[in-house]
Regions:
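Transmembrane-helix signature of 12-pass secondary carriers
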Residues: 2-236, 241-247, 269-329, 357-358, ...
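Short intracellular "coupling" helices and adjacent cytoplasmic loop segments at the cytosolic face
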Residues: 250-264, 329
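Internal, charge-rich low-complexity segments
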Residues: 315-352
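Generic structural motif recognizing short loop/turn segments at the entrances and edges of beta-strands
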Residues: 88, 201, 263, 340-341
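Sparse recognition of residues in long alpha-helices and their boundaries
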Residues: 83, 170, 257-259, 336-337
Length: 517
């Protein structure tokens, strides 16, 4: 024990060579910066980056649907296009984690969002579906850096009192994205113009693609006004820069009249991560500690929770416009006596309608049209806005993350079981909405990636978590889209069992007061 104290003292001495300078731990120094304009501004910038990523990845369904006529897409080609964002995320999750931990959160975000913006803008001029697919793959691969690096950047610049609440507020950004791209899609595709430019026919779907790319550029510009994470700087040995950033945060938050007392800091774990080249060996050195004691248990637990909530939620959320369209179309045709929620999908499976696992505009369309169904828009907006508000309200309970996770998952599992049991379609739709509240757990799990891991591993563990999430969503989407019209009820029962297992796993999460610096 004495030896440990000596080693700890030596680490502090090494980081504060000047004996006349009082050293503060990073968390103490961060608390002294206060909470104010800098934190709120950074929250807004990161919020915009997350919105941009969500629109870039999840808004592609609207674009693909509107472009079907111009690009002459068949169902197989639509499926390939719709899968491009997930392919991009899966390929780049690992490298982004490494770069975030070794090159810097802000630097990675600025380059990634700028590159994604350029690729997304170019995709609006794609002459063929193959070029569109390639550019959207690049765009999503780059924008996917946002999901891990933004949480790390924001979490390391907020004091312990506001950190968990900010993490949950960040999830609200993803809840807001469907409303944005549904509304943009609705109004822009109502326009009627065709302009030949640079050898292509410029129609509304191309304008929509351009508009949906703008948040990527705006996010990159906003990040320019903020500094790198001071904790990252301290972790790689750039202590003076870290203190300078903390001093600037204090100045922005409290003004120039109050002097910032911190002149030296140290990281409590006394670790220093060397910045190396991006090689397979360096990547392995980053990931290996996550699957060894003492991190192994929490890594497996959090990755299982990630698997459960994403396969349960995104498997349905990604094809949500299709689900809404099938529901409202079948219900309009059959009326109140249409049977249960699942009965509507059984009826739809027997009707020769062009229903696929991507966004559907109209049930039967004799000719090409870019117009988006109003029922799909209204349902999508209601879902996005209500979840945004709900998540913002739940962020006020950030101090009770563990119990919140368990309660949400249990309620969602019960709703999934009852969806078809009620025997009535509208109540089934309401319960389906309740089931989708599993999305509220996204931010909670992300906050655990920040609080339960040392600084040098946070970017990597979050990025691998994102890879687990997207692989789960990709697999689940294909399973659900194939099963919901033939084995709808068993699909929900199986999902309910999976969600319950997630609630049981959440019971083993550490207490909310546990945090690793």
């Amino acid at each position: 024990m004495t030896e440990d104290k000596t080693k700890r003292s030596d680490n502090i001495e090494m980081r504060c060579a000047d004996a006349s300078v009082k050293c503060y731990s990073y968390e103490e120094a961060l608390d002294l910066t206060g909470h104010g304009k800098y934190n709120i501004g950074l929250l807004f910038a990161c919020f915009m980056v997350i919105i941009a990523m969500g629109i870039d990845i999840f808004g592609l369904g609207i674009i693909v649907t509107a472009a079907t006529c111009d690009l002459g897409l068949n169902l197989q080609q639509i499926g390939i296009l719709s899968s491009m964002p997930f392919a991009g995320i899966i390929v780049m999750s690992y490298p982004w984690g490494y770069l975030s931990d070794t090159r810097g959160r802000r630097l990675v975000l600025m380059w990634a969002m700028t590159g994604s913006f350029i690729s997304a803008v170019l995709s609006s001029l794609a002459p063929s579906w193959q070029v569109l697919a390639a550019l959207r793959f690049i765009s999503s691969a780059l924008s996917s850096a946002a999901e891990s690096a933004t949480y790390a950047l924001l979490g390391e610049c907020c004091n312990s009192r506001s950190r968990a609440r900010y993490m949950l507020l960040m999830t609200s950004a993803l809840m807001l994205t469907p409303t944005l791209y549904y509304v943009w899609g609705y109004f822009i595709t109502k326009l009627n113009f065709s302009i030949y430019i640079m050898g292509i026919l410029y129609r509304p779907w191309r304008l929509l693609t351009l508009v949906m790319a703008l948040p990527l550029g705006i996010g990159a510009i906003l990040l320019w006004f903020f500094n790198e994470s001071p904790k990252f700087l301290a972790n790689v040995g750039r202590m003076e820069e870290a203190v300078d950033v903390l001093r600037r945060m204090h100045e922005v938050n409290k003004g120039k009249t109050e002097i910032y007392p911190v002149q030296g800091i140290y990281l409590e774990e006394g670790s220093k991560e060397e910045v190396g080249q991006l090689t397979l060996r360096s990547l392995w050195l980053q990931i290996a500690p996550l699957f060894k004691p003492p991190l192994l248990g929490r890594t497996l637990l959090l990755y299982y929770l990630t698997f459960v909530i994403y396969i349960a939620n995104n498997s349905f959320a990604i094809i949500l416009p299709t689900i809404f369209n099938v529901f409202f179309t079948s219900y309009a045709n059959l009326g109140p006596n249409s049977g249960s929620f699942c009965d509507l999908f059984y009826v739809a499976s027997e009707t020769p309608a062009p229903i696929t696992n991507t966004t559907i505009i109209e049930p039967v369309i004799p000719e090409c049209t870019d117009t988006i169904s109003e029922n799909t828009i209204l349902a999508g907006c209601a879902h996005g806005l209500s979840f945004f508000v709900l998540n913002a309200l739940l962020s006020q309970c950030a101090g009770r993350r563990k119990i919140l996770t368990i309660v949400i998952l249990v309620i969602a599992a019960i709703a999934a079981v009852l969806i078809n049991v009620t025997g009535e379609a509208i109540s089934g739709l309401v319960l389906f909405y309740v089931f989708l509240t599993t999305a509220m757990v996204f931010g909670i799990v992300s906050s655990y990636f920040v609080t339960l891991y040392p600084t040098s591993y946070r970017g990597m563990v979050a990025c691998i978590g994102m890879m687990v999430a997207r692989l789960s969503a990709f697999t689940g989407t294909n399973v659900v889209s194939a099963a919901i019209t033939t084995t709808c009820a068993p699909t929900f029962y199986g999902t309910a069992a999976l969600v319950i297992s997630g609630a049981v796993a959440a019971w083993f999460l550490p207490s909310d007061s546990t945090e690793i610096n």
